[in-house]
Protein backbone atom coordinates (compact mmCIF):
# COMPACT_ATOMS: atom_id res chain seq x y z
CA UNK A 1 0.00 0.00 0.00
CA UNK A 2 1.12 3.54 -0.73
CA UNK A 3 2.49 5.46 2.24
CA UNK A 4 0.42 8.50 1.20
CA UNK A 5 -2.73 6.39 1.07
CA UNK A 6 -2.05 4.98 4.54
CA UNK A 7 -1.39 8.48 5.82
CA UNK A 8 -4.82 9.69 4.69
CA UNK A 9 -6.95 6.55 5.10
CA UNK A 10 -7.25 3.62 7.46
CA UNK A 11 -7.53 0.48 5.32
CA UNK A 12 -10.14 -2.06 6.39
CA UNK A 13 -11.41 -5.42 5.20
CA UNK A 14 -11.45 -6.67 1.63
CA UNK A 15 -14.89 -6.23 0.08
CA UNK A 16 -14.27 -7.22 -3.53
CA UNK A 17 -11.83 -8.61 -6.03
CA UNK A 18 -11.73 -8.37 -9.81
CA UNK A 19 -9.61 -9.17 -12.81
CA UNK A 20 -7.02 -6.48 -12.12
CA UNK A 21 -7.35 -5.42 -8.52
CA UNK A 22 -8.72 -5.77 -5.04
CA UNK A 23 -11.18 -3.48 -3.24
CA UNK A 24 -11.01 -2.66 0.48
CA UNK A 25 -13.18 -0.61 2.76
CA UNK A 26 -11.29 2.44 4.01
CA UNK A 27 -11.94 5.34 6.37
CA UNK A 28 -10.72 8.91 6.07
CA UNK A 29 -8.43 9.72 8.98
CA UNK A 30 -9.49 13.38 8.86
CA UNK A 31 -13.28 13.05 8.61
CA UNK A 32 -14.11 9.47 9.60
CA UNK A 33 -16.08 9.04 6.37
CA UNK A 34 -16.12 5.54 4.85
CA UNK A 35 -15.04 4.88 1.27
CA UNK A 36 -13.91 2.01 -0.94
CA UNK A 37 -10.38 1.85 -2.35
CA UNK A 38 -9.50 -0.16 -5.46
CA UNK A 39 -5.83 -1.17 -5.59
CA UNK A 40 -4.09 -2.45 -8.73
CA UNK A 41 -0.52 -3.77 -8.76
CA UNK A 42 0.55 -2.75 -12.26
CA UNK A 43 3.86 -4.61 -11.94
CA UNK A 44 1.95 -7.92 -11.97
CA UNK A 45 0.28 -7.18 -15.31
CA UNK A 46 2.21 -9.00 -18.03
CA UNK A 47 -0.04 -8.07 -20.94
CA UNK A 48 0.57 -4.71 -22.66
CA UNK A 49 -3.16 -4.03 -23.05
CA UNK A 50 -3.80 -4.80 -19.37
CA UNK A 51 -1.05 -2.37 -18.33
CA UNK A 52 -2.42 0.31 -20.65
CA UNK A 53 -5.94 -0.13 -19.26
CA UNK A 54 -4.71 0.00 -15.65
CA UNK A 55 -2.75 3.18 -16.33
CA UNK A 56 -5.61 5.02 -18.02
CA UNK A 57 -8.42 3.84 -15.72
CA UNK A 58 -8.06 6.55 -13.03
CA UNK A 59 -8.17 9.37 -15.59
CA UNK A 60 -11.18 7.99 -17.45
CA UNK A 61 -13.01 7.10 -14.22
CA UNK A 62 -12.55 10.64 -12.91
CA UNK A 63 -13.64 12.16 -16.23
CA UNK A 64 -16.73 9.94 -16.41
CA UNK A 65 -17.69 10.50 -12.77
CA UNK A 66 -17.31 14.27 -12.44
CA UNK A 67 -20.81 15.69 -12.04
CA UNK A 68 -22.33 12.40 -13.20
CA UNK A 69 -24.66 11.02 -10.49
CA UNK A 70 -24.99 7.72 -12.32
CA UNK A 71 -21.30 6.85 -11.92
CA UNK A 72 -19.45 5.88 -8.74
CA UNK A 73 -17.45 8.96 -7.75
CA UNK A 74 -13.65 8.93 -7.52
CA UNK A 75 -12.44 11.04 -4.59
CA UNK A 76 -8.68 10.55 -4.72
CA UNK A 77 -6.00 8.72 -6.70
CA UNK A 78 -2.63 7.59 -5.33
CA UNK A 79 0.07 6.22 -7.64
CA UNK A 80 3.64 5.05 -7.24
CA UNK A 81 6.00 3.02 -9.43
CA UNK A 82 3.94 -0.17 -9.07
CA UNK A 83 0.54 0.54 -7.55
CA UNK A 84 -2.54 2.58 -8.39
CA UNK A 85 -5.13 3.20 -5.65
CA UNK A 86 -8.51 4.84 -6.34
CA UNK A 87 -10.62 6.02 -3.41
CA UNK A 88 -14.28 5.83 -4.40
CA UNK A 89 -17.81 5.95 -3.05
CA UNK A 90 -18.74 3.08 -0.76
CA UNK A 91 -22.16 1.89 -1.94
CA UNK A 92 -24.61 0.53 0.61
CA UNK A 93 -26.19 -2.19 -1.48
CA UNK A 94 -25.20 -5.19 -3.59
CA UNK A 95 -24.24 -5.10 -7.23
CA UNK A 96 -27.01 -5.64 -9.76
CA UNK A 97 -26.00 -9.25 -10.44
CA UNK A 98 -26.31 -10.26 -6.78
CA UNK A 99 -29.57 -8.31 -6.50
CA UNK A 100 -31.05 -10.28 -9.41
CA UNK A 101 -29.81 -13.57 -7.96
CA UNK A 102 -31.52 -12.79 -4.65
CA UNK A 103 -34.81 -12.87 -6.56
CA UNK A 104 -34.24 -16.60 -7.30
CA UNK A 105 -35.40 -16.45 -10.91
CA UNK A 106 -38.29 -14.04 -10.41
CA UNK A 107 -38.25 -11.29 -13.04
CA UNK A 108 -37.74 -7.70 -11.98
CA UNK A 109 -41.06 -5.81 -12.33
CA UNK A 110 -41.03 -3.92 -15.62
CA UNK A 111 -41.34 -0.41 -14.10
CA UNK A 112 -38.37 -1.13 -11.80
CA UNK A 113 -36.29 -2.60 -14.64
CA UNK A 114 -37.15 0.39 -16.83
CA UNK A 115 -36.04 2.79 -14.12
CA UNK A 116 -32.72 0.99 -13.60
CA UNK A 117 -32.05 0.97 -17.35
CA UNK A 118 -32.99 4.65 -17.58
CA UNK A 119 -30.45 5.46 -14.86
CA UNK A 120 -27.82 3.42 -16.69
CA UNK A 121 -28.66 5.15 -19.99
CA UNK A 122 -28.33 8.60 -18.42
CA UNK A 123 -24.95 7.68 -16.95
CA UNK A 124 -23.70 6.27 -20.26
CA UNK A 125 -24.97 9.23 -22.25
CA UNK A 126 -22.87 11.62 -20.16
CA UNK A 127 -19.84 9.30 -20.35
CA UNK A 128 -20.17 9.21 -24.14
CA UNK A 129 -20.55 12.98 -24.43
CA UNK A 130 -17.25 13.22 -22.55
CA UNK A 131 -15.56 10.78 -24.91
CA UNK A 132 -15.44 7.76 -22.58
CA UNK A 133 -16.64 4.29 -23.63
CA UNK A 134 -17.04 1.92 -20.66
CA UNK A 135 -16.70 -1.33 -22.69
CA UNK A 136 -17.73 -3.69 -19.86
CA UNK A 137 -21.32 -2.80 -18.99
CA UNK A 138 -22.82 -5.75 -17.10
CA UNK A 139 -24.79 -6.31 -13.87
CA UNK A 140 -21.59 -6.96 -11.90
CA UNK A 141 -20.47 -3.41 -12.73
CA UNK A 142 -23.67 -1.69 -11.63
CA UNK A 143 -23.79 -1.03 -7.89
CA UNK A 144 -26.97 -0.28 -5.98
CA UNK A 145 -28.11 1.78 -3.05
CA UNK A 146 -31.25 -0.07 -2.00
CA UNK A 147 -34.02 1.38 0.14
CA UNK A 148 -36.24 -1.21 1.86
CA UNK A 149 -39.50 0.05 0.36
CA UNK A 150 -40.77 -3.21 -1.11
CA UNK A 151 -40.01 -5.20 -4.23
CA UNK A 152 -41.61 -2.61 -6.53
CA UNK A 153 -39.30 0.21 -5.44
CA UNK A 154 -36.37 1.14 -7.64
CA UNK A 155 -32.85 1.19 -6.21
CA UNK A 156 -30.40 3.90 -7.12
CA UNK A 157 -28.06 2.39 -9.72
CA UNK A 158 -24.53 3.58 -10.45
CA UNK A 159 -22.03 2.44 -13.06
CA UNK A 160 -18.70 1.25 -11.66
CA UNK A 161 -15.35 -0.22 -12.74
CA UNK A 162 -13.78 1.63 -15.66
CA UNK A 163 -10.97 -0.91 -15.86
CA UNK A 164 -11.80 -1.70 -19.49
CA UNK A 165 -12.72 1.85 -20.55
CA UNK A 166 -11.36 3.60 -23.62
CA UNK A 167 -10.97 7.23 -24.63
CA UNK A 168 -12.81 7.71 -27.94
CA UNK A 169 -13.27 11.47 -27.89
CA UNK A 170 -16.50 13.43 -27.98
CA UNK A 171 -16.73 13.49 -31.79
CA UNK A 172 -17.69 9.89 -32.47
CA UNK A 173 -14.25 8.32 -32.22
CA UNK A 174 -13.60 4.60 -32.39
CA UNK A 175 -11.95 2.00 -30.16
CA UNK A 176 -10.30 -1.32 -30.94
CA UNK A 177 -9.65 -4.60 -29.12
CA UNK A 178 -11.72 -7.51 -27.85
CA UNK A 179 -12.55 -6.11 -24.42
CA UNK A 180 -15.51 -6.92 -22.19
CA UNK A 181 -17.46 -9.94 -20.97
CA UNK A 182 -18.59 -12.54 -23.56
CA UNK A 183 -22.31 -12.61 -22.71
CA UNK A 184 -22.55 -8.81 -22.86
CA UNK A 185 -20.14 -7.85 -25.65
CA UNK A 186 -21.46 -6.40 -28.92
CA UNK A 187 -20.97 -8.19 -32.25
CA UNK A 188 -18.84 -5.41 -33.74
CA UNK A 189 -16.41 -5.87 -30.83
CA UNK A 190 -16.24 -9.62 -31.45
CA UNK A 191 -15.66 -9.15 -35.18
CA UNK A 192 -12.25 -7.59 -34.58
CA UNK A 193 -12.80 -4.22 -36.23
CA UNK A 194 -13.14 -0.80 -34.67
CA UNK A 195 -16.30 0.23 -32.83
CA UNK A 196 -17.89 3.16 -31.05
CA UNK A 197 -19.80 3.98 -27.90
CA UNK A 198 -22.91 2.10 -29.07
CA UNK A 199 -21.19 -1.12 -28.00
CA UNK A 200 -22.13 0.02 -24.49
CA UNK A 201 -25.78 0.31 -25.55
CA UNK A 202 -25.79 -3.32 -26.75
CA UNK A 203 -24.43 -4.36 -23.35
CA UNK A 204 -27.09 -2.31 -21.55
CA UNK A 205 -29.71 -4.07 -23.68
CA UNK A 206 -28.42 -7.42 -22.42
CA UNK A 207 -28.68 -6.06 -18.85
CA UNK A 208 -32.32 -5.14 -19.47
CA UNK A 209 -32.96 -8.64 -20.86
CA UNK A 210 -31.44 -10.18 -17.71
CA UNK A 211 -33.63 -8.04 -15.44
CA UNK A 212 -36.90 -8.76 -17.22
CA UNK A 213 -36.23 -12.50 -17.64
CA UNK A 214 -35.17 -13.11 -14.05
CA UNK A 215 -31.55 -13.83 -14.94
CA UNK A 216 -31.62 -15.45 -18.39
CA UNK A 217 -29.18 -14.36 -21.10
CA UNK A 218 -29.98 -13.77 -24.78
CA UNK A 219 -26.83 -15.53 -26.02
CA UNK A 220 -25.33 -18.62 -24.40
CA UNK A 221 -22.85 -21.42 -24.83
CA UNK A 222 -20.69 -23.87 -22.92
CA UNK A 223 -17.47 -21.92 -23.49
CA UNK A 224 -16.56 -18.28 -24.05
CA UNK A 225 -15.89 -19.11 -27.70
CA UNK A 226 -19.38 -20.62 -28.02
CA UNK A 227 -20.93 -17.52 -26.47
CA UNK A 228 -19.06 -15.17 -28.82
CA UNK A 229 -20.14 -17.29 -31.79
CA UNK A 230 -23.76 -17.02 -30.63
CA UNK A 231 -23.40 -13.24 -30.31
CA UNK A 232 -22.10 -13.08 -33.89
CA UNK A 233 -24.77 -15.25 -35.53
CA UNK A 234 -27.79 -15.07 -33.24
CA UNK A 235 -30.80 -12.79 -32.97
CA UNK A 236 -32.63 -11.67 -29.87
CA UNK A 237 -35.60 -13.86 -28.97
CA UNK A 238 -38.12 -13.57 -26.17
CA UNK A 239 -39.30 -17.04 -25.05
CA UNK A 240 -42.93 -16.82 -23.87
CA UNK A 241 -42.15 -18.73 -20.67
CA UNK A 242 -39.82 -15.87 -19.66
CA UNK A 243 -41.35 -12.81 -21.34
CA UNK A 244 -45.11 -13.39 -21.42
CA UNK A 245 -45.62 -10.57 -18.93
CA UNK A 246 -43.28 -8.11 -20.64
CA UNK A 247 -44.83 -5.33 -22.73
CA UNK A 248 -44.31 -5.03 -26.50
CA UNK A 249 -42.72 -1.61 -25.90
CA UNK A 250 -40.04 -3.09 -23.62
CA UNK A 251 -39.29 -5.86 -26.12
CA UNK A 252 -39.03 -3.30 -28.91
CA UNK A 253 -36.61 -1.21 -26.86
CA UNK A 254 -34.39 -4.24 -26.24
CA UNK A 255 -34.41 -5.06 -29.97
CA UNK A 256 -33.30 -1.51 -30.75
CA UNK A 257 -30.59 -1.63 -28.10
CA UNK A 258 -29.35 -5.00 -29.37
CA UNK A 259 -29.70 -4.18 -33.06
CA UNK A 260 -26.92 -5.99 -34.94
CA UNK A 261 -26.40 -2.99 -37.23
CA UNK A 262 -24.38 -0.62 -35.06
CA UNK A 263 -25.46 2.40 -37.11
CA UNK A 264 -29.18 1.66 -36.64
CA UNK A 265 -28.82 0.82 -32.96
CA UNK A 266 -30.15 3.29 -30.40
CA UNK A 267 -27.70 5.66 -28.77
CA UNK A 268 -27.59 6.01 -24.99
CA UNK A 269 -29.65 9.20 -25.40
CA UNK A 270 -32.38 7.23 -27.20
CA UNK A 271 -32.10 4.22 -24.90
CA UNK A 272 -34.05 5.63 -21.97
CA UNK A 273 -37.37 3.79 -21.50
CA UNK A 274 -40.57 5.76 -21.14
What are these regions (language model features)?
Residues 76-77:
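A short, aromatic-enriched beta-strand patch in the conserved N-lobe beta-sheet
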Residues 116-117:
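Activation segment signature within eukaryotic-like protein kinase domains
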Residues 72, 81-89, 97-98:
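A conserved loop-to-beta-strand element in the N-lobe of protein kinase catalytic cores
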Residues 22:
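Conserved N-lobe ATP-binding subsite of Hanks-type protein kinase domains
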Residues 40-65:
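Conserved N-lobe beta3->alphaC-helix segment of eukaryotic protein kinase catalytic domains
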Residues 200:
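Conserved catalytic-loop aspartate of Hanks-type protein kinases
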Amino acid sequence: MSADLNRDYEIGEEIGRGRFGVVHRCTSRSTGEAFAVKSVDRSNLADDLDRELAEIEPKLAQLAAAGNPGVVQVHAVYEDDSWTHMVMDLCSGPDLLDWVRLRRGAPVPEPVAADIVAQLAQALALCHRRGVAHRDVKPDNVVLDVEDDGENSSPRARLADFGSAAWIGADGGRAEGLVGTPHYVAPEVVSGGDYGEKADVWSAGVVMYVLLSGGALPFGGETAKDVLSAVMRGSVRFPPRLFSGVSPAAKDLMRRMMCRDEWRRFSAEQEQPT
